[in-house]
Amino acid sequence: MPSGSLTIEQILTLLAEGPPRIATLTAGLVPAQLHTSPNPDEWSANDVLAHLRSCADVWGSCIAVIIAEDTPTIRAVNPTTWIKKTDYRELEFQPSLHAFATQRTDLLAVFEPLAPEDWSRTATVTGAGKPLVRTLHTYAQWLARHERPHVKQIERIVNTMRM
């Protein structure tokens, strides 16, 4: 993946690939395997999915506000804090993956009608130090870039479970 800024098409491709890739990787595993950590200090596949859902919630809501409002002010929320307000870690993997995939389909549908200039829409983000100006492109790119190594993490976990 390029180290610079991703194009809109690259972002959309990466976002579309995540949920089906996770589904393919985890096909055939039983719930106990998906909830088992390969090592004591590591996440299970379910923990990784819960984290991805939390990030999608937080950054997806920022994206929605940026699209809906002109130059809004958004209070930063850490996905690690947000996950504590959910039951994502306790959910069964397959229904959780289905919810994640549905959320992703909905997000991609929101992006579909956007003009290229809409990706430059901004928000001022507060609550994490000095206020920062972030774009729709920034949030979408964070989501896409952040997800990729976690999908690889799920692949490593699954390979361990299948040994």
Descriptions of predicted regions:
Residues 18-21, 25, 55, 103, ...:
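Amphipathic, well-ordered alpha-helical segments in soluble domains
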Residues 35-81, 108, 119-163:
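Short, contiguous alpha-helical
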Residues 14-18, 83-120:
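Acidic/histidine-rich alpha-helical segments that form the ligand environment
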Residues 11, 15, 41, 100, ...:
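Aromatic-acidic/polar surface patches that form glycan- and anion
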Residues 7-11, 92-97, 139-140:
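Active-site rim elements
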Residues 28-29, 39:
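A glycine-rich, hydrophobic loop/mini-helix early in the fold
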Residues 21-28, 106-113, 149:
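Solvent-exposed, charged/polar functional surfaces in cytosolic regulatory/catalytic domains
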Residues 1-20:
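Extreme N-terminal tail/first-helix region
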